[in-house]
Amino acid sequence: MCYLLTMVLLAGILIVPVFAASDADSASDKKWVIATDTVFKPFEYTDDDGNFVGIDVDVLDAIAKDQGFEYKLKSLGWDASIAACQAGQADGMIAGASITDERKDSGWLFSDGYYNATQSMTVQKDSDIKGFDDLKGKTVGVKTGTQGATYAESLKDEYGFNITYYEDSPTMYQAVLGGQVVACFEDTPIMASSIKDGDLALQ
């Protein structure tokens, strides 16, 4: 049975759903394969030495020590991590995401949260776009399956812009810098970290 240790953000809440294993699969009997998305700094990412680090990684390590199990972390990306869990190719997943009613209704369980997240939009530093009204007729970028995508979708019809979807954040930011899209949406802490650490010419 799959353990799902997914970190989830929404309206000031970051929480961890855990799907319990069957009695036959004691946590201490095996090394669990945990999938993740390591381009979501500061929650999960790789350092200069290629090690998996971040808030979610620290939480997973603490859970493993408390519950007495070993694990192997695999960076698969968000969609692939979910698919691996569903197919039994991974025992669980830990990654930054957002709480939605749809996820609750599908059976995700949530603990108390620890992070307050909001959504932000960024553009090139020399862009004439100052607000949502300036997006009319233009195209923005979002990462597939994120709250940033949901937020942009909620504004799309009102402000008359188009949306292009990307599988990871770095590609999305490069699309803004390269002019393929005029702006992008993402969780504020992820965006701030990406712009600062990558020294990106975005604002």
Task: Specify the residue positions occupied by each region the protein language model found.
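Short Pro/Gly-enriched coil loops immediately N-terminal to beta-strands
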Residues: 108-120, 169
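Ligand-binding cleft/hinge of the Venus flytrap
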Residues: 44-48, 60-69, 148-167, 195-199
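Short helix-initiation/N-cap motifs at beta->coil->alpha
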Residues: 57-58, 73-84, 127, 163-180
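Beta->alpha turn/N-cap motifs
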Residues: 36-40, 74-79, 88-101, 125, ...
